[in-house]
Amino acid sequence: LRHEYDYGKTELGVIPTYKGRVSSTGLSKDGWITGIRHVRTLKNNSAFEIVVGQLSNAQASEAFAIGNEDEYVEVEYSARMGEQHSYELSVEKILQGSFVRGEYRYRLNESDTVFFELVQRTDESAAKVVFGSSGEFAATFSGNSYPIEYFAYYSYINSVFGPRAELIEDFLGTGHGGSLEFSGVASRQHNLEWFVRLDVVDSVSRLLAGVKISFRTRN
């Protein structure tokens, strides 16, 4: 159930996690939260968000039973400062762990953005650090120019960071790691895109390649 207002929105029931790709914290292992989210849009391009629920419990009646092992609580403030700067600050309670998270993005130009994220576990001496860049460039094939998107980052996750690390969308393991991805349009007519991605964490590597199809109608 979702209700949108002029000043924000409220979602109730089984809701998506909405974590951004840049912060690499998409909680796709379980994928959904059973609970409630409220977003309040504030002045000066800022917003306040609160989420309360269960990360993996399929029983809706347990969505507000704070204290269970799969509880999920998040309070976040996000803001944009002009056209170049934006940031997020949040506190989280996930799977018996407490965390403070900060993310900063800087838009270098029309095509490129650099970012930095720090997630500090407050009940343990452990952290997750990410920094990198995303954007778009043009490649020429047979005299034609094709836009290609890229996404690259370095990350470090402490070995005692806890189960929250395993919920990260592209989690391979703790330690030093990095990721490089390229993607582009394969067919505009069929809403088809291609992608190639390489993930490396210490001695573990993973290569992903494929196509994505969108069922959303283009304007």
Show where each model-derived region lies.
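Outer membrane beta-barrel
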Residues: L1-A60, S78, S159
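Outer-membrane beta-barrel and related beta-rich outer-membrane complex signature
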Residues: S24, A60-F64, R164, R206-L208
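Short, solvent-exposed loop/turn segments at conserved positions within beta-propeller repeat blades
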Residues: K29-G31, I66-D70
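A conserved mid-domain beta-alpha-beta active-site/ligand-binding segment of alpha/beta enzyme cores
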Residues: L55, V73, S90-I94
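Alpha-helical scaffold segments
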Residues: S56-A58, E69, Q84
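Outer-membrane beta-barrel pore domains
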Residues: S78, Q84-N219
